[in-house]
Amino acid sequence: MLCLAVCTMTLAQAQDQLKVITFNIKSFENSNFDVKPFAKLLAEENADIICLNEVENRSARQMDPKTLKYRDVVQDLAANLKLFGVFGYSYNLMNKKGDEDESKYTFCQDELYGNAILSRYPILNINAMQLPRPANSADQRGVVTAEILLPSGKMVRVACTHLDHIGGQMEQAKVLVGSNVLSATIPTILTGDMNQWPGTEVIKLLDASYDRLCQEGKTYQAGSKLDYIYGSKGAFEVVEKRIAANVCDGVTLSDHFPVISVIKFK
C-alpha cells in the first residue's frame, strides 16, 4: 500500500512537471537544412515542449533533391522526435517585405517563415496571428499558440513568438500582454526570441506581466540574452533552468543557444 501511494504521488508529480525548450534555429541553415542534427540535439534533452524560432518551412532551398518536392520540415522534425508539431507562419518568403497582398502567396502553403511548437502531449487548439509591424521594424512577426492536454488532465497554453530585431518590439510586446494570447483562465507559457536584453523597456514590460522562468546569461553568440521563457503569474515553480550547448557532432547549429527550463504547477 505504501509503495502504491509513493508511486502514485511520483506519477502525479511527474505529470505536473514540464521540461520546456526555446531555441532560435536559424532556419536549419547551419546543417544545410537537415533536421537530423537538431533532432539528435533535442532528443538528448527529452523535453516535453519545444518552441522554435526562425523556422523556414516548405521552402525552395529545403526541397528534397531527389523528388524536388517541398518538405514540411516541422513535421519531419516532429516525426524524428516522436512529438506532435504545429507551425505558425509570420510571413511568406516570397513576400518578406509585405509590399503586396499576402493572401495571394499563402494559399499554396509553401515558402513560409515563422515559429513552431513541438509537444509530447496532444495539441487540442492552435492559433497563429501576426503582430504589429511599425514602420521602424524589419519584418512581419507573429505568434503561434497551442493548447496542450497533459496526462494529469490539466491544460496548458504555450505561445511561441519572435519579436523584430530592428524596431517595433514594444508595440509587439504590448499586443502579447494585452490580447488573449496569454489566457487568464489557462496557465500559459510564453517563449521566444524577444530580440531585447534584460533591463530594456520591453523586457521590463514582460517581467511585470509574467514570471520569468529561465536562466540568466547570454543566449546569443554575440553575447546578449535575447531568448526567454515566461509563465503566467504565480502558476509555475522552476525546478531547473539552464542554457545548453548549440553544437551537435561538431556542427554549430545556430547563432543562438537552447534555453531550457523544468517547471511544475504550483
Regions inferred by a protein language model and the residue ranges of each:
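Acidic helix-start/capping segments at beta-turn-to-alpha-helix junctions
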Residues: 55-59, 90-96
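Nuclease and nuclease-like effector domains acting on nucleic acids or nucleotide cofactors
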Residues: 6
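A basic- and aromatic-enriched beta-loop-alpha substructure that forms the phosphate/nucleotide-
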Residues: 87
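Membrane-embedded segments
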Residues: 58-76
